[in-house]
Amino acid sequence: MAHNYERSVFYQLNLENAAGEFARYDLSLPEPLSESAPLMTRISDNMFRARVQQLKGLAYREYENEAFRLMRDGLTASALAKRQQPHLSVYSDQIVWGRSPVRIDLAGGWTDTPPYCLNEGGNVVNIAIELNGQPPLQVYVKPCREYKIILRSIDLGAMEVVTTYGEVRDFMQVGSPFSIPKAALVLAGFQPGFSTESYVSLEEQLKAFGSGMEITLLSAIPAGSGLGTSSILASTVLGAISDFCGLNWDKNEICNRTLILEQLLTTGGGWQDQYGGVLR
């Protein structure tokens, strides 16, 4: 069945049980699937191979990582297909102020985690909450006279000045306090391949844009609190940048791009966190 998957129901089986049988009887893995195979089939195939190898006590991370890479690439392809054209939409003395609550997950947690939710769907019940009557996640975006991007974090006491596309693209740097705004800037079109226009440098793009940019973050609740902090902060950053850059993303688009942003950061996780804070 595995060798003849195109005409069989192999990848519709319980692949956890199938992997157990392959390991139990020491069966050889089927031939790798071609790149023309459906994306979800290729993801399932790699997770199946990873589980078989794991049960046999063999190296399996390569297959597992490939499965998540395929899922990440499949999601980010939608962002590349819809390139952005950011333009300054505020006056020099104006500030865009984004604020969001966090959320409490009442039921259904982890049913929103891929690839499970892609096959089975997910159902999660959330409620949005504030901290002492105020939204605990806040983002400020304002023009900067110099053609650079200044990133600040009030709660972390950190600052970084970004002057090149390479520095924007460096959002996967371990321990960086500005991974989220950098990835958000990429999705907003401040990176070759994500913009409808082509520029030699970030400075040239900012000159065409009309100003530099200063982004300030404030999170009164730490990441890892279980309240969807990172995801909702990402949505707040994306929403503020959208208003500042005239991208006109609605709430559903912002939440969808948050999913893509988290895939860019390779943090993964569930897909409903941001909805609990944005759709209220």
Where are these regions (language model features)?
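Short, conserved phosphate/pyrophosphate- and ester-handling motifs at nucleotide-, phospho-/glycolipid
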Residues: S230
